[in-house]
């Protein structure tokens, strides 16, 4: 954001978030989210709005840095971000959802099934999607379609579980892989 005019930063941020979602990659919004809370116990209205807008744009994760690394009010900063993000989640509108088209020429069965599973949660009385995952690909596909209900991803590798912790709406659960399906 240093080499572009400051008035372009919000638009660029929104475009980058959209591109990441379309590419099914986790997107983290960071950098000075609550910068004034390094030295002050309360954020500015602009900072609160920045957090809410990141949620409205459907970012996967928010991150604090200096506020918690060396700020005077690290716990207050975390509590503030949590409260603002939770309220923004309640207030977000469906018309802000990013529509992710399926490539008609693609044979990506995982993406197709993920989109159908997310659609099903809005049409049927389904309150969660459960998947297992070695690499996290299926869970990331489900996250990209930004469903209303959580994706419970059972991961056989701790690294996959940690990576999925950043994905929108995904609750990753580690389960050691057993020798065969009969053992589960």
Segments predicted by a language model, with ranges:
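Glycine-rich phosphate-binding active-site loops on the catalytic face of alpha/beta enzymes
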Residues: 1-2, 50-74
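Helical hairpin unit composed of two closely spaced alpha helices linked by a short loop
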Residues: 4-32, 36, 147-148
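C-terminal helical cap(s) of enzyme catalytic domains, especially alpha/beta-barrels
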Residues: 13, 68-91
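Long, charged amphipathic helices and adjacent flexible linkers at domain junctions
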Residues: 22, 80-118
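Hydrophobic faces of well-ordered beta-strands that scaffold small-molecule active sites
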Residues: 27-30, 55, 62-64, 151
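Conserved, mostly hydrophobic/aromatic
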Residues: 32, 54, 142
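Catalytic cores of alpha/beta
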Residues: 35-57
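Nucleotide-binding motor/catalytic cores of P-loop/tubulin-like NTPases across gene-expression machines
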Residues: 138-140, 146-183
């Amino acid at each position: 954001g240093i080499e572009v005019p400051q008035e372009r930063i919000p638009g660029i941020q929104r475009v980058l978030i959209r591109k990441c979602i379309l590419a099914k990659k986790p997107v983290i919004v960071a950098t000075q989210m609550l910068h004034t809370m390094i030295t002050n116990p309360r954020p500015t209205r602009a900072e609160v709005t920045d957090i809410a807008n990141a949620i409205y744009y459907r970012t996967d994760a928010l991150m604090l840095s200096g506020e918690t690394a060396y700020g005077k009010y690290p716990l207050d900063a975390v509590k503030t971000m949590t409260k603002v993000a939770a309220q923004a989640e309640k207030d977000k509108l469906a018309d802000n959802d990013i529509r992710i088209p399926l490539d008609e020429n693609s044979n990506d069965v995982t993406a197709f099934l993920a989109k159908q599973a997310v659609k099903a949660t809005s049409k049927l009385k389904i309150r969660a999607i459960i998947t297992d995952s070695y690499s996290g690909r299926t869970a990331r596909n489900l996250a990209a379609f930004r469903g209303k209900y959580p994706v419970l991803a059972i991961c056989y590798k701790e690294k996959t579980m940690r990576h999925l912790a950043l994905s929108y709406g995904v609750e990753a659960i580690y389960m050691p892989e057993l020798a065969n399906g009969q053992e589960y």
